[in-house]
């Protein structure tokens, strides 16, 4: 997404104070070669708060900001995130059989938004995304979700595998959507609490997440094209869960 379309703060002191105050950011751009005590303090805070950051040439910041950015540009989060414990508590508190989605490397913001929209329509409770290596939840994602991202819990985690294991220990079945199985989606019981794992558009689900999954499920393909767009595939699995729960 173009930087001028996003909400942001710039300047070393404003960003430093905002991070100290607990303001949520999608990412922070830092000019290459920054030094000094305030820079070191900011770096420590970004790491401790697991806020993604990137070093970029000063020209990029000059194009994005008409002002004294001092080498720091921070993009404000479009939504308020919850931690994994709060996500689980809210999900189990609102439904006997909650439905969650884990996005393992989905990089397109419109796909992310479309997945969130389908999940909300299917009665799902929340979505889990990686802090790094996935699509940013920005204005485009919120728009593509038709506001769904504002209506459900979103959890951003530094380690997807640890978060997924926590879900397992909390009673959720992990279902990986993959063609690397003979089990079709109709063969997998989705009537209880479950989290559907969806992989990246190009590589699919990582091996680490596949190894952790309780079940693997494939969508049957009858045509010559062998795969669906990730947002469409997500909706197919979600509504198979809905179908099973209605018939239960």
Show which residues each predicted segment covers:
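N-terminal positively charged helical leader segments and presequences
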Residues: 1-90
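Active-site/ligand-binding-proximal alpha/beta "capping" segment
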Residues: 175-230
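Structured adenosyl-cofactor binding patch, chiefly the S-adenosyl-L-methionine
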Residues: 16, 21-22, 143-148, 207-248
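Surface-exposed amphipathic alpha-helices with a cationic face
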Residues: 47, 164-168, 242
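RNA substrate-binding interface of SAM-dependent RNA methyltransferases
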Residues: 17-23, 92-183
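Short beta->alpha connector loops at strand-helix junctions that form conserved
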Residues: 57, 77, 104, 130-131, ...
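Active-site helix-initiating loop/hinge in glycosyltransferases
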Residues: 11, 104, 111, 227-229
